[in-house]
Amino acid sequence: MERKVFVKKGISVFLFCAVCALPFFAEWNSFDIPDSAEIRRQVSREWFEGSLDVVRGLNSEIRSNQVGTQFQIRLEEQQDIFLVIAAPKSQMKVDIYEGGGVRAAVEDSYNIDSPGAWILARSKQNGSPLSVRYCFAKDAGVYVQFRPNQDGRTSLADMIIFDSYAARGVPLGVPFETFYTASFAQIQALTKNNLPWASVQPKAGLYDGALVMVQTIRENLPNIVSEDDAAYNEEGLPVFINNGQSRYVPQEVRQKLTLSSNGFVKWICDGIVEPLAGSYLKLKPLVQPTVNVNPTGAKGVLAAKYSANFSLDWTRNLAAAVLSVRNNKTLLYKDSGVDVSVEPFATRWTDKGFQNAAGYIANTGYRMQYLKPLLYVLATVNPQYFYLAAIRQTAKGSVGNETGVFNDSAAIFPYFDADGKFKAIVFFDGVEYSLQQFCSLYGKAGDIFVHLTRVKATAKFYPQEPAKEKKND
Protein backbone atom coordinates (compact mmCIF):
# COMPACT_ATOMS: atom_id res chain seq x y z
CA MET A 1 0.00 0.00 0.00
CA GLU A 2 2.80 2.34 0.87
CA ARG A 3 4.50 1.58 -2.41
CA LYS A 4 1.38 2.52 -4.39
CA VAL A 5 1.20 5.85 -2.63
CA PHE A 6 4.87 6.44 -3.26
CA VAL A 7 4.52 5.65 -6.98
CA LYS A 8 1.55 7.97 -7.34
CA LYS A 9 3.45 10.83 -5.74
CA GLY A 10 6.44 10.03 -7.87
CA ILE A 11 4.38 10.34 -11.02
CA SER A 12 3.09 13.73 -9.92
CA VAL A 13 6.61 14.96 -9.24
CA PHE A 14 7.82 13.58 -12.57
CA LEU A 15 5.04 15.31 -14.50
CA PHE A 16 5.73 18.61 -12.80
CA CYS A 17 9.46 18.32 -13.48
CA ALA A 18 8.80 17.33 -17.10
CA VAL A 19 6.87 20.54 -17.66
CA CYS A 20 9.53 22.63 -16.01
CA ALA A 21 12.34 20.88 -17.89
CA LEU A 22 11.02 21.91 -21.29
CA PRO A 23 12.35 25.13 -22.83
CA PHE A 24 10.35 27.48 -20.67
CA PHE A 25 9.27 29.85 -23.41
CA ALA A 26 9.10 27.44 -26.32
CA GLU A 27 7.52 29.41 -29.17
CA TRP A 28 6.98 26.63 -31.72
CA ASN A 29 4.20 24.07 -31.38
CA SER A 30 2.57 21.52 -33.64
CA PHE A 31 -0.36 23.86 -34.34
CA ASP A 32 2.05 26.67 -35.30
CA ILE A 33 0.16 29.23 -33.21
CA PRO A 34 1.68 32.27 -31.44
CA ASP A 35 2.63 31.76 -27.81
CA SER A 36 2.49 34.21 -24.90
CA ALA A 37 4.33 32.17 -22.24
CA GLU A 38 7.24 34.62 -21.93
CA ILE A 39 4.88 37.59 -21.66
CA ARG A 40 2.70 35.84 -19.08
CA ARG A 41 5.72 35.21 -16.87
CA GLN A 42 6.48 38.92 -16.92
CA VAL A 43 2.98 40.01 -15.89
CA SER A 44 1.90 37.06 -13.75
CA ARG A 45 2.08 38.67 -10.31
CA GLU A 46 0.01 41.76 -11.13
CA TRP A 47 -2.43 40.43 -13.69
CA PHE A 48 -3.01 36.85 -12.51
CA GLU A 49 -2.60 37.04 -8.75
CA GLY A 50 -3.77 40.58 -7.94
CA SER A 51 -7.25 41.28 -6.59
CA LEU A 52 -10.02 42.43 -8.92
CA ASP A 53 -9.54 46.01 -7.71
CA VAL A 54 -5.82 45.80 -8.50
CA VAL A 55 -6.47 44.37 -11.96
CA ARG A 56 -9.10 47.02 -12.63
CA GLY A 57 -6.46 49.64 -11.99
CA LEU A 58 -4.14 48.23 -14.66
CA ASN A 59 -4.14 49.58 -18.18
CA SER A 60 -4.28 47.19 -21.11
CA GLU A 61 -0.78 46.40 -22.35
CA ILE A 62 0.71 45.48 -25.70
CA ARG A 63 3.78 43.26 -25.38
CA SER A 64 5.83 41.23 -27.85
CA ASN A 65 7.06 37.67 -27.43
CA GLN A 66 10.52 36.45 -28.43
CA VAL A 67 9.66 36.20 -32.13
CA GLY A 68 8.00 39.62 -32.27
CA THR A 69 4.32 38.65 -32.15
CA GLN A 70 2.33 41.24 -30.25
CA PHE A 71 -0.15 40.29 -27.52
CA GLN A 72 -2.63 42.46 -25.69
CA ILE A 73 -3.05 41.85 -21.95
CA ARG A 74 -6.43 43.10 -20.77
CA LEU A 75 -9.32 42.65 -18.35
CA GLU A 76 -12.89 41.76 -19.28
CA GLU A 77 -15.67 41.49 -16.73
CA GLN A 78 -18.78 39.33 -16.77
CA GLN A 79 -21.57 38.99 -14.22
CA ASP A 80 -19.90 36.59 -11.78
CA ILE A 81 -16.38 36.25 -13.15
CA PHE A 82 -13.60 38.34 -14.58
CA LEU A 83 -11.21 37.35 -17.33
CA VAL A 84 -7.56 38.20 -17.82
CA ILE A 85 -6.75 37.75 -21.49
CA ALA A 86 -3.53 37.48 -23.46
CA ALA A 87 -4.68 37.79 -27.08
CA PRO A 88 -2.38 37.77 -30.12
CA LYS A 89 -2.53 40.47 -32.74
CA SER A 90 -4.42 39.60 -35.88
CA GLN A 91 -5.77 41.55 -38.80
CA MET A 92 -9.42 41.85 -39.68
CA LYS A 93 -10.98 43.04 -42.91
CA VAL A 94 -13.56 45.77 -42.35
CA ASP A 95 -15.78 48.00 -44.48
CA ILE A 96 -15.52 51.71 -43.72
CA TYR A 97 -18.48 53.86 -44.71
CA GLU A 98 -17.53 57.43 -45.53
CA GLY A 99 -18.71 60.17 -47.89
CA GLY A 100 -21.55 58.09 -49.17
CA GLY A 101 -19.20 55.28 -50.21
CA VAL A 102 -17.59 52.17 -48.77
CA ARG A 103 -13.92 51.29 -48.76
CA ALA A 104 -12.26 48.10 -47.60
CA ALA A 105 -9.61 48.33 -44.92
CA VAL A 106 -7.59 46.10 -42.62
CA GLU A 107 -7.54 46.77 -38.89
CA ASP A 108 -5.52 45.28 -36.06
CA SER A 109 -7.52 43.25 -33.57
CA TYR A 110 -6.84 41.19 -30.45
CA ASN A 111 -9.66 38.66 -30.40
CA ILE A 112 -10.34 36.64 -27.29
CA ASP A 113 -10.78 33.44 -29.29
CA SER A 114 -7.95 33.78 -31.83
CA PRO A 115 -5.52 30.85 -32.10
CA GLY A 116 -2.87 31.52 -29.48
CA ALA A 117 -5.17 33.38 -27.08
CA TRP A 118 -4.90 32.54 -23.38
CA ILE A 119 -7.68 33.28 -20.87
CA LEU A 120 -7.67 33.11 -17.07
CA ALA A 121 -11.12 33.10 -15.44
CA ARG A 122 -11.49 34.09 -11.79
CA SER A 123 -14.40 34.47 -9.40
CA LYS A 124 -15.57 37.99 -8.64
CA GLN A 125 -16.77 36.88 -5.23
CA ASN A 126 -13.43 35.80 -3.79
CA GLY A 127 -10.89 36.12 -6.60
CA SER A 128 -10.23 32.37 -6.74
CA PRO A 129 -9.03 31.00 -10.10
CA LEU A 130 -11.60 28.96 -12.01
CA SER A 131 -9.92 27.96 -15.27
CA VAL A 132 -7.24 28.68 -17.83
CA ARG A 133 -8.16 28.31 -21.49
CA TYR A 134 -5.76 27.86 -24.41
CA CYS A 135 -7.25 28.65 -27.82
CA PHE A 136 -5.46 26.79 -30.60
CA ALA A 137 -8.02 26.13 -33.36
CA LYS A 138 -9.37 28.39 -36.09
CA ASP A 139 -12.83 27.57 -34.73
CA ALA A 140 -13.61 29.46 -31.52
CA GLY A 141 -15.61 26.57 -30.06
CA VAL A 142 -12.60 24.25 -29.98
CA TYR A 143 -10.14 24.68 -27.11
CA VAL A 144 -8.43 23.05 -24.13
CA GLN A 145 -8.84 24.28 -20.57
CA PHE A 146 -7.48 23.51 -17.12
CA ARG A 147 -9.18 23.79 -13.73
CA PRO A 148 -7.97 23.55 -10.13
CA ASN A 149 -8.63 20.17 -8.56
CA GLN A 150 -10.55 20.05 -5.29
CA ASP A 151 -7.44 18.87 -3.48
CA GLY A 152 -5.94 22.32 -4.06
CA ARG A 153 -2.63 20.84 -5.20
CA THR A 154 -3.27 19.46 -8.68
CA SER A 155 -5.38 20.28 -11.73
CA LEU A 156 -7.92 18.87 -14.17
CA ALA A 157 -7.95 19.07 -17.97
CA ASP A 158 -10.86 19.42 -20.41
CA MET A 159 -10.96 19.33 -24.21
CA ILE A 160 -14.04 20.98 -25.71
CA ILE A 161 -15.36 20.78 -29.28
CA PHE A 162 -18.43 22.98 -29.80
CA ASP A 163 -19.81 22.50 -26.26
CA SER A 164 -19.13 18.75 -26.31
CA TYR A 165 -16.40 17.39 -24.07
CA ALA A 166 -13.96 15.06 -25.80
CA ALA A 167 -12.34 14.83 -22.35
CA ARG A 168 -13.54 16.23 -19.04
CA GLY A 169 -11.88 16.32 -15.64
CA VAL A 170 -8.73 14.44 -16.63
CA PRO A 171 -6.45 14.57 -13.54
CA LEU A 172 -2.98 16.05 -13.98
CA GLY A 173 -0.29 15.87 -11.32
CA VAL A 174 0.77 19.52 -11.56
CA PRO A 175 -0.39 22.63 -9.67
CA PHE A 176 -2.97 24.78 -11.40
CA GLU A 177 -0.61 27.76 -11.29
CA THR A 178 1.62 25.90 -13.75
CA PHE A 179 -0.71 27.07 -16.50
CA TYR A 180 -0.17 30.74 -15.71
CA THR A 181 3.17 30.55 -17.52
CA ALA A 182 3.21 27.22 -19.40
CA SER A 183 3.57 27.46 -23.17
CA PHE A 184 1.22 25.66 -25.52
CA ALA A 185 4.00 23.25 -26.46
CA GLN A 186 4.44 22.43 -22.79
CA ILE A 187 0.78 21.69 -22.17
CA GLN A 188 0.72 19.51 -25.28
CA ALA A 189 3.67 17.53 -23.95
CA LEU A 190 2.06 17.25 -20.54
CA THR A 191 -1.27 15.96 -21.90
CA LYS A 192 -0.17 14.02 -24.99
CA ASN A 193 -1.27 10.73 -23.39
CA ASN A 194 -4.29 12.17 -21.56
CA LEU A 195 -6.20 14.25 -24.12
CA PRO A 196 -7.42 13.16 -27.60
CA TRP A 197 -5.28 15.57 -29.61
CA ALA A 198 -5.77 13.45 -32.75
CA SER A 199 -9.42 14.56 -32.74
CA VAL A 200 -8.53 18.24 -33.15
CA GLN A 201 -5.62 18.22 -35.60
CA PRO A 202 -6.89 18.63 -39.20
CA LYS A 203 -5.09 16.77 -41.97
CA ALA A 204 -4.15 19.40 -44.55
CA GLY A 205 -4.37 18.35 -48.20
CA LEU A 206 -6.55 15.27 -47.66
CA TYR A 207 -9.89 16.86 -48.53
CA ASP A 208 -9.30 17.26 -52.28
CA GLY A 209 -11.57 14.37 -53.28
CA ALA A 210 -14.43 15.69 -51.18
CA LEU A 211 -13.98 19.22 -52.52
CA VAL A 212 -14.02 18.00 -56.13
CA MET A 213 -17.27 16.16 -55.42
CA VAL A 214 -18.78 19.22 -53.73
CA GLN A 215 -17.95 21.45 -56.68
CA THR A 216 -19.27 18.93 -59.22
CA ILE A 217 -22.53 18.45 -57.33
CA ARG A 218 -22.88 22.22 -56.93
CA GLU A 219 -22.51 22.75 -60.67
CA ASN A 220 -25.24 20.19 -61.37
CA LEU A 221 -27.83 21.51 -58.91
CA PRO A 222 -29.57 23.82 -61.43
CA ASN A 223 -30.38 20.71 -63.46
CA ILE A 224 -32.08 18.84 -60.61
CA VAL A 225 -35.80 18.98 -59.86
CA SER A 226 -37.27 17.51 -56.68
CA GLU A 227 -39.92 14.84 -57.16
CA ASP A 228 -41.29 12.26 -54.73
CA ASP A 229 -40.18 8.63 -55.02
CA ALA A 230 -37.96 9.44 -58.01
CA ALA A 231 -34.62 7.92 -59.00
CA TYR A 232 -32.76 6.49 -62.00
CA ASN A 233 -31.99 2.81 -62.43
CA GLU A 234 -28.75 1.11 -63.43
CA GLU A 235 -29.32 2.10 -67.06
CA GLY A 236 -29.97 5.75 -66.24
CA LEU A 237 -33.73 5.46 -66.86
CA PRO A 238 -36.28 7.25 -64.63
CA VAL A 239 -38.09 4.88 -62.28
CA PHE A 240 -40.11 4.89 -59.07
CA ILE A 241 -38.07 3.85 -56.04
CA ASN A 242 -41.08 2.20 -54.42
CA ASN A 243 -41.60 -0.44 -57.10
CA GLY A 244 -38.84 0.04 -59.67
CA GLN A 245 -41.39 0.65 -62.41
CA SER A 246 -40.78 3.04 -65.29
CA ARG A 247 -41.59 6.64 -64.42
CA TYR A 248 -43.05 9.17 -66.84
CA VAL A 249 -41.14 12.46 -66.95
CA PRO A 250 -43.16 15.48 -68.14
CA GLN A 251 -41.87 17.24 -71.22
CA GLU A 252 -41.14 20.48 -69.35
CA VAL A 253 -38.52 18.78 -67.15
CA ARG A 254 -37.08 16.33 -69.69
CA GLN A 255 -33.86 18.35 -69.83
CA LYS A 256 -33.38 18.03 -66.08
CA LEU A 257 -32.96 15.20 -63.58
CA THR A 258 -36.01 14.49 -61.42
CA LEU A 259 -35.04 13.07 -58.03
CA SER A 260 -36.36 12.56 -54.53
CA SER A 261 -34.01 13.10 -51.58
CA ASN A 262 -33.18 9.39 -51.65
CA GLY A 263 -32.80 9.35 -55.42
CA PHE A 264 -30.47 12.33 -55.05
CA VAL A 265 -28.00 10.50 -52.78
CA LYS A 266 -28.12 7.52 -55.16
CA TRP A 267 -27.27 9.91 -57.99
CA ILE A 268 -24.20 10.99 -56.00
CA CYS A 269 -23.13 7.39 -55.36
CA ASP A 270 -23.77 6.51 -59.02
CA GLY A 271 -21.23 9.19 -59.93
CA ILE A 272 -18.59 7.24 -58.00
CA VAL A 273 -19.62 3.81 -59.26
CA GLU A 274 -20.17 4.41 -63.00
CA PRO A 275 -16.52 5.21 -63.86
CA LEU A 276 -15.51 1.95 -62.13
CA ALA A 277 -18.31 -0.42 -63.15
CA GLY A 278 -19.61 1.11 -66.38
CA SER A 279 -23.17 1.32 -65.08
CA TYR A 280 -25.18 2.79 -62.23
CA LEU A 281 -26.38 0.93 -59.14
CA LYS A 282 -29.37 -1.40 -59.29
CA LEU A 283 -32.34 -0.42 -57.14
CA LYS A 284 -33.47 -3.76 -55.76
CA PRO A 285 -30.43 -4.40 -53.53
CA LEU A 286 -30.75 -0.88 -52.10
CA VAL A 287 -34.19 -1.45 -50.56
CA GLN A 288 -33.28 -4.65 -48.71
CA PRO A 289 -34.04 -4.36 -44.97
CA THR A 290 -31.10 -3.94 -42.61
CA VAL A 291 -33.11 -4.04 -39.37
CA ASN A 292 -35.10 -6.92 -37.93
CA VAL A 293 -38.49 -5.54 -36.94
CA ASN A 294 -40.87 -7.12 -34.44
CA PRO A 295 -43.95 -7.86 -36.57
CA THR A 296 -46.29 -7.19 -33.65
CA GLY A 297 -44.61 -3.94 -32.59
CA ALA A 298 -45.44 -0.43 -33.77
CA LYS A 299 -42.84 -0.54 -36.53
CA GLY A 300 -43.92 -4.03 -37.52
CA VAL A 301 -47.52 -2.95 -37.95
CA LEU A 302 -46.37 0.12 -39.86
CA ALA A 303 -44.05 -2.00 -42.01
CA ALA A 304 -47.06 -3.89 -43.36
CA LYS A 305 -47.94 -0.73 -45.27
CA TYR A 306 -44.71 1.28 -45.32
CA SER A 307 -41.06 0.83 -44.35
CA ALA A 308 -40.32 2.93 -41.27
CA ASN A 309 -36.61 2.34 -41.90
CA PHE A 310 -36.57 3.17 -45.59
CA SER A 311 -33.79 5.79 -45.79
CA LEU A 312 -31.80 3.95 -43.11
CA ASP A 313 -31.82 0.80 -45.27
CA TRP A 314 -31.24 2.87 -48.41
CA THR A 315 -28.15 4.74 -47.18
CA ARG A 316 -26.63 1.64 -45.59
CA ASN A 317 -27.07 -0.40 -48.75
CA LEU A 318 -25.79 2.47 -50.91
CA ALA A 319 -22.59 2.78 -48.88
CA ALA A 320 -22.10 -0.99 -48.95
CA ALA A 321 -22.70 -1.07 -52.72
CA VAL A 322 -20.07 1.62 -53.38
CA LEU A 323 -17.60 -0.29 -51.21
CA SER A 324 -18.42 -3.50 -53.10
CA VAL A 325 -17.68 -1.91 -56.47
CA ARG A 326 -14.42 -0.44 -55.21
CA ASN A 327 -13.27 -3.78 -53.79
CA ASN A 328 -14.61 -5.76 -56.76
CA LYS A 329 -16.30 -7.98 -54.21
CA THR A 330 -19.95 -8.20 -53.18
CA LEU A 331 -20.38 -6.98 -49.61
CA LEU A 332 -23.74 -7.04 -47.89
CA TYR A 333 -24.44 -4.22 -45.47
CA LYS A 334 -23.94 -6.45 -42.41
CA ASP A 335 -20.39 -7.26 -43.53
CA SER A 336 -19.42 -3.81 -44.79
CA GLY A 337 -18.69 -1.83 -41.61
CA VAL A 338 -20.06 1.36 -43.17
CA ASP A 339 -22.03 2.57 -40.13
CA VAL A 340 -20.61 5.46 -38.13
CA SER A 341 -20.96 4.52 -34.45
CA VAL A 342 -18.09 6.31 -32.73
CA GLU A 343 -18.53 7.81 -29.24
CA PRO A 344 -16.02 10.68 -29.09
CA PHE A 345 -17.74 12.66 -26.32
CA ALA A 346 -18.59 12.05 -22.68
CA THR A 347 -20.70 15.08 -21.78
CA ARG A 348 -22.22 18.12 -23.42
CA TRP A 349 -22.85 21.62 -22.07
CA THR A 350 -26.42 22.84 -22.62
CA ASP A 351 -28.68 25.60 -21.33
CA LYS A 352 -29.62 23.18 -18.55
CA GLY A 353 -26.02 22.49 -17.55
CA PHE A 354 -23.94 19.38 -18.19
CA GLN A 355 -25.74 16.44 -19.74
CA ASN A 356 -24.40 13.03 -20.66
CA ALA A 357 -23.76 12.84 -24.40
CA ALA A 358 -26.38 10.58 -25.95
CA GLY A 359 -23.89 9.35 -28.53
CA TYR A 360 -24.75 6.65 -31.03
CA ILE A 361 -27.97 4.64 -30.71
CA ALA A 362 -28.07 1.47 -32.79
CA ASN A 363 -30.37 1.67 -35.82
CA THR A 364 -31.22 5.25 -34.84
CA GLY A 365 -28.03 7.32 -35.07
CA TYR A 366 -27.15 10.59 -33.34
CA ARG A 367 -29.28 13.50 -32.20
CA MET A 368 -29.16 16.27 -34.78
CA GLN A 369 -27.79 18.85 -32.30
CA TYR A 370 -24.82 16.50 -31.80
CA LEU A 371 -23.85 16.62 -35.48
CA LYS A 372 -21.46 19.59 -35.53
CA PRO A 373 -18.91 18.34 -32.96
CA LEU A 374 -19.24 14.81 -34.31
CA LEU A 375 -18.54 15.87 -37.89
CA TYR A 376 -15.59 17.97 -36.70
CA VAL A 377 -14.00 14.84 -35.23
CA LEU A 378 -14.87 12.75 -38.29
CA ALA A 379 -13.33 15.35 -40.62
CA THR A 380 -10.17 15.25 -38.52
CA VAL A 381 -9.85 11.50 -38.00
CA ASN A 382 -11.26 10.34 -41.38
CA PRO A 383 -10.47 13.22 -43.75
CA GLN A 384 -11.09 11.32 -46.99
CA TYR A 385 -14.73 10.45 -46.36
CA PHE A 386 -18.17 11.98 -46.78
CA TYR A 387 -21.35 10.69 -45.19
CA LEU A 388 -24.80 9.55 -46.25
CA ALA A 389 -27.30 10.72 -43.66
CA ALA A 390 -30.61 9.00 -43.01
CA ILE A 391 -32.96 11.39 -41.20
CA ARG A 392 -35.24 9.98 -38.51
CA GLN A 393 -38.34 11.91 -37.52
CA THR A 394 -41.18 11.09 -35.16
CA ALA A 395 -44.54 10.20 -36.66
CA LYS A 396 -47.76 10.02 -34.69
CA GLY A 397 -50.04 7.06 -35.23
CA SER A 398 -53.81 7.07 -35.48
CA VAL A 399 -54.16 6.27 -31.77
CA GLY A 400 -51.65 8.89 -30.67
CA ASN A 401 -48.63 6.61 -30.40
CA GLU A 402 -45.29 7.88 -31.73
CA THR A 403 -42.90 6.00 -34.00
CA GLY A 404 -39.54 6.98 -35.40
CA VAL A 405 -39.47 6.83 -39.20
CA PHE A 406 -36.65 7.25 -41.71
CA ASN A 407 -38.06 8.99 -44.79
CA ASP A 408 -35.35 11.23 -46.26
CA SER A 409 -31.61 11.19 -46.76
CA ALA A 410 -28.80 13.66 -47.45
CA ALA A 411 -25.08 13.74 -48.21
CA ILE A 412 -22.73 15.57 -45.83
CA PHE A 413 -19.20 16.67 -46.69
CA PRO A 414 -17.21 17.81 -43.62
CA TYR A 415 -13.77 19.33 -44.25
CA PHE A 416 -11.29 22.00 -43.21
CA ASP A 417 -10.68 24.88 -45.59
CA ALA A 418 -7.30 26.30 -46.60
CA ASP A 419 -7.26 28.46 -43.45
CA GLY A 420 -7.89 25.46 -41.21
CA LYS A 421 -11.49 26.38 -40.42
CA PHE A 422 -14.11 23.65 -40.15
CA LYS A 423 -16.87 23.54 -42.76
CA ALA A 424 -19.63 21.07 -43.55
CA ILE A 425 -21.64 21.17 -46.77
CA VAL A 426 -24.96 19.34 -46.86
CA PHE A 427 -26.73 18.36 -50.08
CA PHE A 428 -30.36 17.55 -49.41
CA ASP A 429 -33.18 17.06 -51.90
CA GLY A 430 -31.27 18.82 -54.68
CA VAL A 431 -30.31 21.86 -52.58
CA GLU A 432 -27.01 22.88 -50.97
CA TYR A 433 -27.05 23.90 -47.29
CA SER A 434 -24.53 24.80 -44.65
CA LEU A 435 -24.74 22.47 -41.66
CA GLN A 436 -26.44 25.18 -39.64
CA GLN A 437 -29.02 25.80 -42.38
CA PHE A 438 -29.70 22.09 -42.71
CA CYS A 439 -30.26 21.64 -38.97
CA SER A 440 -32.49 24.74 -38.96
CA LEU A 441 -34.85 23.02 -41.40
CA TYR A 442 -36.00 20.90 -38.47
CA GLY A 443 -36.22 23.72 -35.94
CA LYS A 444 -35.32 22.91 -32.35
CA ALA A 445 -37.05 19.55 -32.31
CA GLY A 446 -35.15 17.30 -29.93
CA ASP A 447 -36.46 14.11 -31.47
CA ILE A 448 -34.62 14.36 -34.80
CA PHE A 449 -31.87 11.78 -35.28
CA VAL A 450 -29.38 11.37 -38.10
CA HIS A 451 -27.81 8.03 -38.93
CA LEU A 452 -24.51 8.22 -40.82
CA THR A 453 -22.78 5.81 -43.16
CA ARG A 454 -19.32 6.52 -44.56
CA VAL A 455 -18.31 6.64 -48.22
CA LYS A 456 -14.79 7.43 -49.41
CA ALA A 457 -14.69 10.59 -51.51
CA THR A 458 -12.98 10.68 -54.89
CA ALA A 459 -11.91 13.18 -57.52
CA LYS A 460 -12.97 10.64 -60.17
CA PHE A 461 -16.60 11.61 -59.84
CA TYR A 462 -18.88 11.68 -62.89
CA PRO A 463 -22.59 11.79 -61.98
CA GLN A 464 -25.34 11.33 -64.54
CA GLU A 465 -26.14 14.45 -66.54
CA PRO A 466 -29.53 15.38 -68.01
CA ALA A 467 -28.16 15.15 -71.54
CA LYS A 468 -27.35 11.51 -70.90
CA GLU A 469 -30.82 10.70 -69.61
CA LYS A 470 -32.46 8.20 -71.90
CA LYS A 471 -35.94 9.09 -73.07
CA ASN A 472 -38.68 7.19 -71.31
CA ASP A 473 -42.11 7.87 -72.70
Regions found by a protein language model. Name each.
Residues S12-P23:
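Bacterial N-terminal signal peptides
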Residues A26-D473:
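Cysteine-nucleophile amide-bond enzymes
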